[in-house]
Amino acid sequence: MRKKIMLSMLAIMTAVTVQAQIGYKGQVTAAIDGGITHLGGYVGAARIGAYLSPHSVLGGGVMFDKIRYDATQGDSFDATQWLGEIHYQYAVALNRFVLLPSGGLLLGGESCDRLSHQGNLLPYQNQFVYGLFAEFGVEYVFSRHWAVTLNPRFQYLMKTNFDNLKVSASIGLKYYF
């Protein structure tokens, strides 16, 4: 009986410790993720963030987005966007799950091939792009420092040669320092 009580107390202590390691003021996180867009492109991101309070996270990162667009008569071309992001997240901890609704600014550049895959000249130029995004992340904390993240994301680029509105979903890993 004494052994069962000790094991129960150890399990409770471990669960409390795991939860206490996530989301304290001054804590820093690093995350990477990858996924797809509704247009069939690929996205990836690397981010860092700092907890300003148990619920407020301020951070930044870099996002990559590559899409192949179809042109006329079976032709196609690739477009790439590199975007820096500044984001604010509101963290809601639910035991091992953390809900992270967030939003922020996107600033970066977009580039496109000069020639299509069939050799046709394209009318697009490399340019500076900017916009906004909203993300509704969920993470599952599986150890003191590691979490798996799922990030559905909506982004709106105000100045772009291509699609202004993109919907994407990505999965990744987050490390809590």
Kindly give the residue locations of the regions a language model identified.
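Cleavable N-terminal export/targeting peptides
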Residues: 1-25
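Transmembrane beta-strand segments of Gram-negative outer membrane beta-barrel proteins
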Residues: 22-36
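Residue-level preference for beta-strand/loop junctions
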Residues: 26, 40, 80-82, 128-130, ...
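Extracytoplasmic loops and strand-loop junctions of Gram-negative outer membrane beta-barrel proteins
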Residues: 28-32, 70, 117-121, 153-156
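Solvent-exposed loop/turn segments connecting transmembrane beta-strands
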Residues: 32-44, 73-76, 158-166
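Gram-negative (and chloroplast) outer-membrane scaffold detector with strong preference
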Residues: 50-120, 127-135, 140-148, 172-177
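Hydrophobic secondary-structure block in the mid-to-C-terminal portion of proteins
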Residues: 155-177
